Amino acid sequence: MGKIIGIDLGTTNSCVAIMEHGKPVVIQNSEGGRTTPSIVAYTNKGERLVGQVAKNQMVTNPENTIYSIKRFMGRRFEEVASEIKMVPYKVEKGQNGDARVNISNIKKQMSPPEISAATLTKMKETAEAYLGEKVTEAVITVPAYFNDAQRQATKDAGKIAGLDVKRIVNEPTAAALAYGIEKKHEEIVAVYDLGGGTFDISILELGDGVFEVKSTNGDTHLGGDNFDDEIIKYLITEFKKDSAIDLSNDKMALQRLKEAAEKAKIELSGAQEASINLPFITADANGPKHLQYTLTRAKFEQMVDHLVQKTKEPCLKAIKDAGLKASDINEVILVGGSTRIPAIQKIVKEIFGQEPNKGVNPDEAVAIGAAIQGGILTGEAKDMVLLDVTPLSLGIETLGGVMTKLIERNTTIPTKKSQVFSTAADNQTSVDIKVLQGEREMASQNRVLGNFILDGIPAAPRGVPQIEVSFDIDANGIVHVSAKDMGTGKEQKIRIESSSGLSEEEIERMVKDAESHAEEDKKLKEGIEAKNIANSLIYQTEKSLKEYGEKITNQDKEAIENKIKELKDTLEGSDISLLKSKTEELQQASYKIAEMMYKDAQASSPAQNNAQNNAGSESKEADYEVVDEDKK
C-alpha cells in the first residue's frame, strides 16, 4: 500500500499532512504556506486559480471567485437560503434540486463537490511535490455533524480529484488523534471545534491507544463566516448613516468589506481595537467616498454574543449524551481558527469550568489527525484504534407519518441494526421505504436521505407479511439500507445517495473535466516557462549585440536581429511548439556572438595566461622541494 495523505478540507482553509517515520508532518504548499485558502476562481480567460492566487484577485472578480463552498456541500437549494445571502457568487437550483454555482466566466453551472475537488487536487499536488511520487489515496475530514448527503458529497469531491477516499473522519475526532498520539494515560477530552463554516463538539475517551467517541453535537450553519458577517452588517449600517449610500448591493465593495472584516476579527483576538480603512469604497456625485472606522473588542463581542451563546447548547447536550458531568472532563481542546476569539475561550471556560488546552495548533490538528488515521490504515501507526459515532439518528417512516428510529445518534460505528415491519393495508404487494435522518418524532420534520420500493410481496391481510429492514453504517458514516420479505426471500438494497447528490455519470464526467484541467494546468505552466526562457534569451542576446555587435560580420548581425524579431512576434501568439522552435533558432544564431566573445577574451590576455602558467610551474617545483626536504 502506498502513502495515504490526510486532508482537512476546511471552509476557509485546507491543510494536508502525511506520516513520515511514524510521525505526522504538515506539508507546505508551493507558495510556502502550511494551510491553503479553500478558494477557487475562474478568470475572464477561463483559467482556473486555486488557493492564495485565487484569494489575491477576489476583490476584482467577486462573481467568479468561490469561497466557503463547504457550506453548500450535499445541500438542497431550499436549505441554503441564509448561506446564499453571505456570498457574492450566483447560487442556483440544480436539475436534481441541489445547490449549484453559476460561473459566468466559463458559462457553466458547477456542483459544490466539483469545486471542492479543485482544492483537493491542490492538496494532492502539494503532497506529490513533497513526496516525489504519485498520490492516489487519502483520508478526508468532515464536520462531525455532517449528515449522510454531506459525507457522500465529500467522497464524491475526492473521487473527482482522482483520490480513492479510504476513510471519512470527523474533524473533532481527528483533532483528538493529533492531541493523543503520544498520550499513554486514560483521560476524557472534549474537542470544541469552531471553523469557518461549522461548529462541532465531541466528547472522547482516550486511553491505551483507543480513541472512543462518546458523543457528538454541533451546528453546520455556524462558523467564523458568521462572525465576519456581523462586522460587515455593522460597517454597512454605519456607512449608510454617515454617507446615505447603501453598499449592500455593490459586490466589489462587499468583497472588500469581507476582507476587512476578517482582518479586523483576527486583529481583535490580540488587540483591544482594530482600524478599518477602505479608501475609495464607492463614489457619488460629489466624488469618491472612503470608509474609516475603529472597531473595539467590546463592541465586537456585543455584536457576536448571540453566535457565541449558540455554541453552549450543543456542548451541554454532548456532555449529557456521554453520560458525564462537565467536571468529569480532563481537557478541553480548541480546534479551528475561530477558537482564537477571546469571547469563545471565555464561554468554553464557563461551560467546562476549566481553561481550555491550547497545546494543539488549531489550524493543523485536523490534518495531522487525518494523516494519523491514514497511518492506522497502512499499519504505520500501530496499536491505535479509532471508534467514532454516528451524529444523527437513522430510521424509516412508518404508519401515521412517524419516524421509527433503528439506530440512535451517538451509536459507535461501523454498526448494523435490523427490525421487522409489516404492511399497513390488506393485499399490499409493495412497500415504499423512506430513509430518514434526524431527531424529530415526525418523519416530515427530518431529512429524507432517500427512498426505495420493495415489491413482489404476496397479497395478504395487513400485518401478516414480515419485512426485515436493515441499516448498516460503515466506518465513513455512510448509510446502506436493505429491505427483505421474509416469506419470499426477495431483497432490495441501496447505498444511500442523497436525492440531491451527484449521479455516477456526473461524477465520471467531472473526473474527466478535472483530468483535462490538470492537462491544461500543465500546458499553461509549460507555456509560461517557454515564454520566460524566450524573454531571457532575447534580453541576453540584445545585451551581447550592443557589446560585441561591431565585432561580428554584418551578415551575422542581421541574421541575429531577424531571429530576435521573429521570436518577439511568436511571443505575441499562443503556439508553444513554434515558440520553442524560434527560441532554438535564436540560440543557434547567437552562438556567433559567443564565439567572438571567447576569441576576444583569449586574445586580450595572452601575457596574463603565460604569467599564470609560469607561476603554476614554479609553485609545483617549490612543492616538490618541500616534500623532498621532509624526506631528508
Curated annotation (Swiss-Prot):
The family this protein is said to belong to: Belongs to the heat shock protein 70 family.
Function: Acts as a chaperone.
PROSITE patterns: HSP70_1, HSP70_2, HSP70_3
Keywords: ATP-binding, Chaperone, Nucleotide-binding, Phosphoprotein, Stress response
Induction remarks: By stress conditions e.g. heat shock.
Keyword Calcium attributed: no
Ranges of Low complexity composition bias in the record: 601-617
Protein name (record): Chaperone protein DnaK
Pfam families tied to this protein: HSP70
Native source organism of the sequence: Borrelia recurrentis (strain A1)
CDD domains named among the record's database cross-references: ASKHA_NBD_HSP70_DnaK-like (cd10234)
Entry's Gene Ontology molecular function annotations: ATP binding; ATP-dependent protein folding chaperone; unfolded protein binding
Location of the region described as Disordered in the Swiss-Prot/TrEMBL record: 601-632
Residues with the Phosphothreonine modification: T198
InterPro entries found in the cross-reference section: ATPase_NBD (IPR043129), Chaperone_DnaK (IPR012725), Heat_shock_70_CS (IPR018181), HSP70_C_sf (IPR029048), HSP70_peptide-bd_sf (IPR029047), Hsp_70_fam (IPR013126)
Biased composition (Basic and acidic residues): 618-632
Domain of life of the source: Bacteria
